């Protein structure tokens, strides 16, 4: 602690130095505050602690009598603005750099290898649904062989079904008559022409059936007269033979070994009609 006499001497010395500074510079500029004041020397700290006993030790006190030289002053604020401190550089290095709009991940590049698109994408992910490729499916389901086997079986079955459908359309196309025989038709045209051709065949079959049902009535009515004609001709032939036998003359003595010469009556042939003729 300083005695009262030392306090008075220090106070008078500080007053005199202050007056001298004010006289030398009538309008002094306010002292520029250094950007980062350097550490105080040991002598200044000891002098402050000894001359200001009413303050606790370690409290910085500005002493006008012990100023630093002009050459040792810190750079001005203008230069320090271009050279930021290490703390500011560390803070800027930790923050993520801002990206422009065209540097953000594009939603079309969203895949297993690149990862999902960020929140700053041009389009929302809910509106764009891209079908994953075979390589991505193999990579995602590589540890699940059951899914891989099921997918392979489904693909082969679909391929087999498509081949059979195409083969059936090709066979149906061969049965359809077209003006250019080698004209290429789509599946829709093949089905439409097949319907028309089937309808034409149905109408043609109905017409043929109607002609066959109405035709045999006329020949059936002509059969009975033909039978009667056969019966009449048979009867006419039998009567003609009877009349010829009757008109044949009988010679005298023409007897079969009859010594008396008596004439025997000639037996008339009575022809009976067979049941077939009747």
From Swiss-Prot:
Main localization (coarse): nucleus
Modified-residue entries (Phosphoserine), positions: 274
Segments of this protein annotated with the region Disordered: 1-46, 212-278
Transmembrane stretches, start-end: none
Top-level taxonomic group: Eukaryota
Keywords assigned by UniProt, alphabetized: DNA-binding, Nucleus, Phosphoprotein, Transcription, Transcription regulation
Any single Pfam family the record assigns to this protein: HLH
GO CC terms in record: nucleus
BP-aspect Gene Ontology terms: B cell differentiation; blood vessel maturation; definitive hemopoiesis; positive regulation of DNA-templated transcription; regulation of DNA-templated transcription
Subunit details: Efficient DNA binding requires dimerization with another bHLH protein.
Protein name: Protein lyl-1
Native organism: Mus musculus (Mouse)
Species lineage: Eukaryota, Metazoa, Chordata, Craniata, Vertebrata
